[in-house]
Amino acid sequence: MYAFYSLLIYIFYSLFRRDGGAAAVSDPGDPTQKSGGQPRGRRRPDQFTSELWSELNSLAGCSESEDGQKGAEGGAAEVSLEEALMRLAEFLSVQLGAEESCGTTPDLGKPGEVPPLLTVTSQLLALLAWTRSPRGRQALLQGTQPTCPVQPSTLDGSLSQEESSSQPTPILDEVPRDETQEHQPLQLEEEQRVWQRLEQLILGQLEELRQQLEQQEEELSRLRLGVGVTDSEKRVQHLTLENEALKQSLSLTRDLLLHWGPGPLPRLSQEEAGALLELQGQLQEAQDTTEALRVQLGAQELQLQGLRGALRQLQQETEQNCRQELQQVHGQLAGLRARMASLRQGCGDLRGLVSTFTQSCQGSLSEAQGQVSWALGALSAGKAKTQLSEGNQAPPTGCSGRLLELKGNIRVLCRLRPAEGQPSSLVSVEPGQGGTITTCYRGRQHCFRLDWVFPQDASQEEVFRQLEPAVLSCLQGYSVCIFTYGQTGTGKTYSMEGPPEDPGIAPRALQLLFREMGTGGHHHVTLSMVEIYNEAVRDLLATGPPERLVVRQGPAGQGGIQVAGLTHWDVPNLETLHQMLSLGRSNRATAATVMNQHSSRSHALVTLTLRAASPPRPQGITGTLHLVDLAGSERVWKAGVASPVQRDPNGARRLREAQAINRSLLALGGVMAALRARRPHVPFRDSQLTRLLQPALWAGTTAVLLLQISTRAEDLGETICSLKFAERVGQVELGPARRRRAPRSGTPSSLSTDTPLTGTSCTPTPSPGSPPSTSPNSCSGLTLEPPGDPPP
């Protein structure tokens, strides 16, 4: 914008300097303004730029030709008119192109849409074109005042009217000098009128510029109230540039008026001069306001930067504080979690103390009841001393009950197989109650302490004497389980069954029970015998071929298990019982291995149910005796079943049997570990063996483990494993033994919530004999019954 005004002022300066600074008056009769002898009409606003450009080019050509002729007189100009006009025209083209590119191309067909800058520029170019014409030169030489055209259309219209009315001759020199002087006053008057009219138009243009200035000031005042600092700054800059442009235009117009007017413009009235001064004051005020706004904008920018910095710092501080608070909350949460864990542990410890205290109280109560029963039993034994012929062989029933309770619910007895030849020095034994077994294996010494350790030369009678109190407790309504455990070939079946000339635990226990029942009231004995072979349950007392039985959980509310298809035999006397046991032993699966010629390949379970009822009461107590002969744990490479093709055609079967035996014994170890740790879930369902032993290993029962070990050096590793298992089993606590009532439905029951063990003795009564018969009941489900009173 400033470059344009500088260029424009430079053009006029050069022009006035070349022409001597003289003024000119437009001649309405100039023949050079004609085009082909025809008067020109008013040009349309949209044709102004192109026509004006053509006129400027023609005028530039004329100027160059004339300047060439008068070069000697006037001298060369500082800048050519053609170059100045080209610069001015290029600026106008760029200005119009910029407006078109911004999407604000003015409609030149409407007078209100023409920009003021373009209007003023057009007026100046029109004036410049007139001064370069021959008539303008003549007017300048005469020193008359020009009628500066404000609008090209006005100038063109006036020129056209003058041309059409005057009809000048093509040769100006031929006009006489006197005639020219005669017409000069008329010309001056007419030109004076034209000058006044053009002066009014210029004053109107000045008023329009003043109004635009006021609009810009109003726009500037509106921008002061705006919120967006960046947009306001851009708008202020734009308005400042427009304000400068308007000031330059106003100054240029004022200078032109002063230069072309008659001296110091004597014709301007005081009001016009005051208006001009007022406009100048408003312009100065607008400049001051713009500068103040610029200063205020800078201050606001600084304030905004400060606010942004403060906001950024506040955000950082808030974020840091939130992170610190979050870390503190996490730390407090971790502390609360640790506190909660400690409280839970303390609660568990308190529960354990309460449980221990409860058990201690129950134990003290049971001990007191046992002492009372001991006294009553001793009194009864003193009265019946003369009536018992074999009183010295077995202790009274009350004594056995108290002794069983004092020794604990689970006892571990250990029996060593007699060594063949020289005894091994790797195993040392301290027999007796609380005896120890010390082994030396791979340079390390292991010591195990058990409830009772038998010497190597212990007889079957000595072994049974330790189990006799537990067997007799069945007559009082308790559930007892005796099972043998150990490596294959260590004598488990020998200790449980024994030969006919030296019977084992099972024949002696049955003989003792029938002897005691023969002197008491009415007793009903039921027998069942099963084996677990390759995880299949088979009935050893079935009349037909053995079938695989299905083990199910008992009905809801009754507990226990049920074996569908299992037969229960009523046993009237001892002879029938021995016959049935012989039948079951003959049906059991046995085979020869490298370690044992008569190795049991299955687990055998004999269940004897005793129900006794006094004549006054229809419902009596029920006791259960479980005799379990477990198959021996074996290592397949030692038993000779690792390569079945080379050793035995049935080696594959022996291998499957060994794998099934080891898996079931491993499941039994898991059950014992869960019972020892008092876990809420005991994995009885991991094996068929543990499922059948669930009634015998539940709370309130009595269990006795007879461990069979070997003292041979090659069996020392398996012996240590068996001793470790027995030591863990000895730590299992099943709780106080409880008595059980017989169910009303007649189904054999194996476990219920009963009264604690007491030393009350049973009076033997003869039992009527009856032939063996098959019980209609076909399951061994266990029914829970409420506790009942002991028999009188």
UniProtKB/Swiss-Prot annotation:
Present in axons and dendrites of neurons in the central and peripheral nervous systems. The keyword Acyltransferase does not apply. Residues 22-45, 142-184, 734-792 are annotated as: Disordered. SMART domains: KISc. Residues 744-764 have a biased composition (Low complexity). CDD domains: KISc_C_terminal. Keywords: ATP-binding, Coiled coil, Cytoplasm, Cytoskeleton, Microtubule, Motor protein, Nucleotide-binding. Residues 409-732 form the Kinesin motor domain. Residues 765-774 have a biased composition (Pro residues). GO terms for biological process: microtubule-based movement. One of its GO terms (cellular component) is microtubule. Its main location: cytoplasm. May play a role in microtubule-dependent retrograde axonal transport. May function as the motor for the transport of multivesicular body (MVB)-like organelles in dendrites. This is Kinesin-like protein KIFC2.
